[in-house]
A protein has these predicted regions:
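Interdomain motor-coupling "hinge/lid" segment immediately C-terminal to the ATP-binding subdomain
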Residues: 2-6, 11-15, 136-208
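Pre-Walker A adenine-sensing motif
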Residues: 15-33
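Hydrophobic anchor at the beta1->P-loop junction of P-loop NTPases
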Residues: 40
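Walker A (P-loop) phosphate-binding loop of P-loop NTPases
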Residues: 44-45
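Conserved lysine of the Walker
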Residues: 48-49
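Short glycine-rich substrate-engagement loop in P-loop NTPases that contacts/grips substrate
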Residues: 63-95
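Structural recognition of the conserved hydrophobic beta-strand(s) that form the central parallel beta-sheet
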Residues: 97, 122-128, 148, 157
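Conserved catalytic/switch belt of AAA+ P-loop NTPases
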Residues: 108-129
Length: 208
């Protein structure tokens, strides 16, 4: 077994330091980042990995106590999640951001072990496979706060492209002020000119 996970720490620092904070998915501000175990699940390509890196960069100026690791990294071919958690803990780590947990066999037991045996450790995990996340969730339901992230709305896409930034409009406002709202928007930009592009590529922000 080759335990030294320095490659993971170097990778974590590089990815978090290089991620942009210019645009964040709306769910970023809706997530409560305080619970000890936080899960984020959703389809591939909707920005889960970026959320983790943005939170590290924004919330941990000193990243010595935080580690981002994708569980499909080759390091896990010869080492276990338990190995990593123990190493991180004895070196003063307090936060783990675990990406692609569904790629790791029995991931749910690994996270349960962290919760039960490392009370000072905080974990945020993501998974793309909805079925596997849900199968494993029964044992985490009392421990993890789960969040669902979907693809970008057309409004998010326009903001992501720098075309138009517009606050969310409630259904009541749409029903009572739809003509006024539509006029305000179209006076700024002809949004339908960009709708085809959104349908082709805008749902998943990984295309940039």
């Amino acid at each position: 077994m080759e335990l030294n996970p320095d490659v993971l720490y170097r990778n974590s620092h590089r990815l978090a330091s290089q991620v942009s904070l210019d645009f964040k998915r709306e769910i970023y501000d809706r997530i409560n980042w305080k619970p000890r175990i936080i899960g984020i699940k959703g389809p591939k390509g909707v920005g889960k990995s970026t959320l983790l890196k943005q939170q590290i960069r924004a919330a941990f100026p000193d990243d010595s106590k935080v580690l981002y690791a994708s569980l499909d990294h080759i390091w896990f071919n010869g080492n276990s999640l338990d190995d990593l958690v123990e190493y991180h803990y004895i070196h003063g780590g307090t936060h783990l951001f675990l990406d692609e947990v569904h790629k790791y066999k029995n991931w749910q037991w690994g996270i349960k072990n962290i919760y039960d045996n490392y009370p000072s450790m905080n974990v945020v995990f993501t998974g793309s496979s909805m079925l596997q996340i849900d199968e494993g969730n029964a044992d985490l339901s009392r421990r993890a706060t789960m969040n669902i992230i979907n693809g970008m709305s057309f409004r998010e896409y326009l903001a992501f492209e720098g075309i138009l930034s517009w606050d969310k409009v409630s259904l009541d406002d749409i029903l009572s002020r739809h003509m006024e709202i539509a006029t305000e928007i179209t006076n700024n930009v002809h949004v339908l000119d960009y709708f085809d592009d959104y349908l082709h590529q805008g749902y998943s922000p990984f295309y940039k």
